[in-house]
Amino acid sequence: MEAIIVYTTFPDWESARKVTRELLERKLIVCANLREHEAMYWWEGKIEEGKEVGAIYKTEVSKWKELRETIKELHPYDVPMIARIDLDKLNREYSEWMARVLFG
């Protein structure tokens, strides 16, 4: 099993929970960590500030393409950042649990 973490942000708790629940129901992820934080970014020529909800999704590399496309489809942002982080080390027990959840 090749575990990955996928990171994205949402404008609010409602959209973060809605998308995350859908990803869980489709078994594209095994777990999510959601956390509110302050964001600063360039948008349409000026610096913006505000609150966002960051989402860390735990999954397996074979789910990456479908997960990315599903996030794009459901995400409220015009240009969501969807980053994949490959994990070269993961404890065996967690890896085995992920496999059971994702693949039965």
UniProtKB/Swiss-Prot annotation:
Keywords: Copper, Cytoplasm, Metal-binding
Subunit annotation: Homotrimer. The binding of the copper ion probably leads to oligomerization.
Main location: cytoplasm
GO cellular component, one term: cytoplasm
GO terms, molecular function: copper ion binding
Lineage, top ranks: Archaea, Methanobacteriati, Methanobacteriota, Thermococci, Thermococcales
Function statement: Involved in resistance toward heavy metals.
Protein name, UniProt field: Divalent-cation tolerance protein CutA
InterPro entries found in the cross-reference section: CutA_tolerance, Ion_tolerance_CutA, N-reg_PII-like_a/b, N-reg_PII/ATP_PRibTrfase_C
Required cofactor(s): Cu cation
Pfam families assigned to the protein according to its UniProt record, in alphabetical order: CutA1
GO biological processes: response to metal ion
Localisation per UniProt entry: Cytoplasm
Family: Belongs to the CutA family.
Cofactor remark: Binds 1 copper ion in the interface between two trimers.
